[in-house]
Design a protein with these regions (language model features):
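RNase H-like, Mg2+-dependent phosphodiesterase core
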Residues: 54-69, 88, 96, 102
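Hydrophobic side chains in beta-strands
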Residues: 39-40, 67, 90, 122
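Generic C-terminus detector
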Residues: 73-75, 79-126
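Active-site "cap" helix and flanking loop/linker of ATP-utilizing ligase/carboxylase catalytic domains
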Residues: 1-62, 73
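Beta-strand->loop->alpha-helix junctions that form or flank phosphate-binding loops
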Residues: 4, 55, 64-71, 112-115, ...
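Short, surface-exposed, polar/charged, turn-prone segments marking secondary-structure boundaries
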Residues: 17-19, 62-67, 93-95, 116-117
Length: 126
């Protein structure tokens, strides 16, 4: 949820860190809120199946999808390959909007056994 809000080029930050000039760099952040929902494999955090086809990624339009436990199957399709499969990050004017965006887009992604927490960012909304 941090990198999507970073407006200063990450390379500039890395170079300033290496040069010892990070304190002089004006690091800028977007005012948008960000919420990330992790899509996990069925059985996670215990044992889970790998190699299950993942569908619906092309339908995600209003969120960023970060791959974690994914791989390309023998037939060239995207498949599950870990417990924490994908992170779906929604951005919005506030946390409520970012949360709504993340969950709406996460629902478009399909794979057998997919599950996720439904309470992400709820403490921040109280």
């Amino acid at each position: 949820v941090l990198l999507p809000r970073l407006e200063t080029p990450l390379l500039d930050i890395v170079i300033a860190t290496l040069d010892g000039t990070l304190a002089e760099l004006d690091i800028r952040w977007s005012e948008q809120a960000a919420v990330c929902v992790i899509l996990a494999s069925g059985g996670y955090p215990g044992s889970y199946k790998k190699g299950l086809p993942i569908e619906g990624l092309a339908d995600v339009q209003d969120a960023l999808v970060f791959h974690a436990g994914t791989a390309v199957g023998e037939d060239g399709t995207l498949v599950t390959n870990g417990g924490r499969v994908l992170g779906v990050t929604g951005l919005g004017r506030d946390i409520a909007e970012a949360r709504q965006q993340a969950y709406a887009e996460a629902d478009k992604i399909r794979f057998e056994g997919k599950h996720y927490r439904t309470d992400i960012a709820m403490k921040a909304l109280r």
